[in-house]
C-alpha cells in the first residue's frame, strides 16, 4: 500500500482501500449529476433536481441505516454510490422525457471511443502495476517514483490510444477563452 507505513494499521489500510474503491465507482455519477442539473438550471428549474436530490439523500440514509448492522462501515460508500447513480439516472430520465437533452451521433461515437480508451488505459495501468509489483512492494523510497512513472505512462498511453481511434482531435484539446 502507498499510505500504510506505520500511520495506519494493516486493517485500516484495507478498509480505507475498500471505501475508496466504492466511492470511486460513484465518481461518474457525481459528475453526471453536476452536468444534468445544469440543464435544469438553464431552464430555470431548480426544484426538480432539488427534489430528486432529497429523495437520493433519503435513499442513501435508509440503505446505510438498514444495512449497517449487517455489513458495517463499508455500506456508507456503497449507499452513497447507489444513491448517486439513482440520482443521475432519474435526472437523465427527466431530461429525456422533457426533451431537454438528446444524444447526437457525434456525441455517441466519441463517447464510446473515450470509454474504450479509458478501459484500455485502466488495463494498461493494471499491467504496469503488475510489472512494477516488486518495486512497489519493497522499495519505499522509490514507491512514489514508480507510481508517478505509471501515471505519466498511462496519460501518454491514453492520449495515444485516443488519437489513434480518433476519440478526439487537436481542435478538441484547445482551450477556448
Predicted features along the sequence, with ranges:
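Membrane-embedded alpha-helical bundles of multi-pass transporters/translocases
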Residues: 1-177
